[in-house]
């Protein structure tokens, strides 16, 4: 696989127009929305669902737009185009993809986090959104087939929240002593497709759950002891040196622990307020051509080194 150029995009929470604008900004789609990114790998870090926030005043225009189902389908279409050129478009699982399992049809949660416009699109297709997205049903199975929990591309690991010890301990390959990423994703896939039980580290929304944990991202700067502990976790993966994540919001893409951890969630979606025209967009670019990887922040004004 060619991982010379990776574009990583943080949480997009149901904002289809912002997602397409980000992809165009990163020079991987044209104005018609078709793939022009060649062998670039686009890795979106989860939380494509739930385009609303409690207490946040959305613009009327955004409130009337749907985006969830469009994003789900567009990722599949664009990935099929990218594969023909040696690239990929992959979205990993975030906590919001799994909320239909944890919260079901909790009416208060749905009122707080799901736009009526998105619910209406599912209804138009005679689909109950919550049921559709639960494990074992069509949408849950689709997520299980297409969205991994964790990815490795070169020396970079991609996960929504944080790597947890519970996930590591359950997935060590006894022959290599390293974490078996294939097993992790296979177990999660089987669960979401209704063919297996939920992995124990995903059973609840606690500290062992890698899509909910904020250990890697809750503090702007982690101390030396925390960084050393995280380094030991990363060393359990074959040839890994960095972890890229979303989940916790910042004003800009940033790093800590000497660039070992990279946080990409910058409240891209209009679910957090703002208009389409004034959102300040960012994506992470990773260039791996031998030697030390080059990290850039891509914006609509160009790109700058990530320090």
Give the positions of each predicted feature.
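Feature recognizes metal-dependent phosphohydrolase scaffolds
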Residues: 1-307
């Amino acid at each position: 696989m060619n991982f010379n150029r990776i574009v990583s995009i943080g949480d997009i929470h149901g904002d289809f127009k912002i997602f397409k604008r980000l992809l165009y900004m990163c020079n991987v789609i044209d104005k018609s929305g078709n793939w022009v990114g060649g062998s670039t790998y686009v890795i979106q870090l989860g939380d494509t669902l739930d385009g609303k926030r409690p207490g946040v005043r959305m613009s009327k225009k955004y409130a009337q737009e749907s985006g969830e189902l469009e994003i789900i389908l567009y990722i599949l279409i664009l990935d099929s185009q990218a594969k023909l050129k040696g690239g990929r478009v992959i979205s990993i699982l975030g906590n919001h993809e799994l909320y239909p399992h944890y919260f079901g049809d909790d009416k208060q949660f749905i009122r707080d986090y799901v736009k009526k416009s998105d619910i209406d699109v599912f209804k138009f297709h005679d689909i109950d959104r919550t049921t559709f997205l639960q494990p074992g049903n069509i949408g849950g199975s689709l997520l299980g087939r297409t969205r991994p929990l964790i990815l490795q591309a070169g020396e970079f690991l991609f996960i929504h929240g944080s790597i947890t010890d519970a996930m590591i301990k359950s997935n060590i390959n006894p022959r290599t002593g390293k974490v078996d990423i294939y097993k992790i994703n296979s177990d999660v896939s089987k669960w979401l497709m209704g063919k297996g039980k939920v992995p124990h580290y995903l059973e609840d929304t606690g500290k062992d759950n890698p899509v909910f944990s904020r250990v890697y991202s809750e503090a702007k700067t982690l101390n030396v002891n925390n960084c050393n502990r995280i380094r030991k976790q990363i060393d359990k993966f074959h040839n890994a040196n960095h972890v890229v994540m979303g989940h916790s919001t910042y004003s800009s893409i940033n790093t800590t622990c000497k660039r070992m951890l990279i946080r990409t969630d910058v409240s891209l979606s209009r679910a957090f307020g703002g208009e389409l025209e004034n959102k300040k967009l960012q994506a992470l670019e990773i260039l791996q051509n031998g030697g030390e990887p080059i990290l850039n922040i891509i914006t609509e004004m160009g790109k700058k080194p990530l320090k």
